[in-house]
């Protein structure tokens, strides 16, 4: 849920956080270990939550966290703030790496116990992220989700909650890729509007 929230929220606090992240990344590019630790403290839980949501396996999610932060360290100097927020970049790295790992592991079936344990952790992480929002914002978001047309809500849920790529969503729904992308984009716009009310 938090990834969806990140896509629709644009508060002053979010702007301040983006600026702090950009400053940290500039320091990391100069080899500042303290800045790296600060960025890790701010985002490791978020990166882990997304990886766990996609992979449904704690150890694999931890591996992704390490890989993402190693990549952040190595590529900090190449980051371009004009292309988006640091957190969005890190979540994109996380999602890509987790989906790659998931595809590589698809041949190995998961046990019901593994899936159940992972769902519990994901539910807890989502609940903690919702605590960051006001009760009114949560209500608006939930109402906005319910008011989405079924086709938009389904495409959005598959992309954000199940970690599917747009191509995979299109295949699962037997819809053209362009249609799926439009539905997801329209759903995010409607949720932003619902939160702004």
Predicted feature locations:
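Amphipathic, Lys/Arg- and hydrophobic-enriched alpha-helical face
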Residues: 9, 40-58, 74-75, 91, ...
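Sigma70-family region 2
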Residues: 29-30, 53-57, 67-83, 104-105
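Residues within the DNA-recognition helix of helix-turn-helix
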Residues: 43, 64, 183-190
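Intrinsic, short, N-terminal disordered tails of RNA polymerase sigma-factor systems
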Residues: 1-30, 38, 114-154, 158, ...
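Arg/Lys-rich amphipathic alpha helix in sigma70-family domain 2
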Residues: 74-78, 92-113, 134
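Structural recognition of an alpha-helix C-terminal capping motif at a helix-to-coil junction
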Residues: 49, 63-70, 84-96, 182
């Amino acid at each position: 849920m938090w990834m969806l929230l990140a896509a629709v929220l644009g508060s002053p606090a979010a702007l301040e956080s983006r600026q702090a992240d950009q400053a940290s990344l500039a320091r990391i590019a100069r080899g500042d270990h303290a800045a790296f630790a600060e960025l890790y403290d701010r985002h490791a839980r978020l990166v882990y939550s997304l990886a766990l949501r996609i992979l449904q396996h704690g150890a694999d999610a931890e591996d992704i966290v390490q890989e993402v932060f190693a990549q952040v360290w190595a590529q900090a100097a190449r980051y371009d703030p004009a292309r988006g927020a640091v957190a969005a970049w890190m979540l994109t790295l996380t999602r890509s790496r987790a989906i790659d790992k998931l595809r590589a592991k698809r041949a190995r079936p998961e046990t019901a116990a593994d899936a159940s344990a992972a769902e519990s952790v994901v539910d807890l992480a989502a609940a903690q992220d919702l605590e960051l929002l006001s009760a009114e914002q949560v209500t608006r978001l939930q109402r906005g989700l319910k008011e989405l047309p079924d086709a938009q809500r389904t495409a959005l849920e598959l992309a954000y909650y199940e970690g599917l790529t747009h191509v995979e969503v299109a295949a699962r729904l037997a819809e053209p890729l362009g249609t799926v992308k439009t539905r997801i984009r329209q759903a995010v716009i409607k949720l932003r509007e619902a939160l702004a009310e």
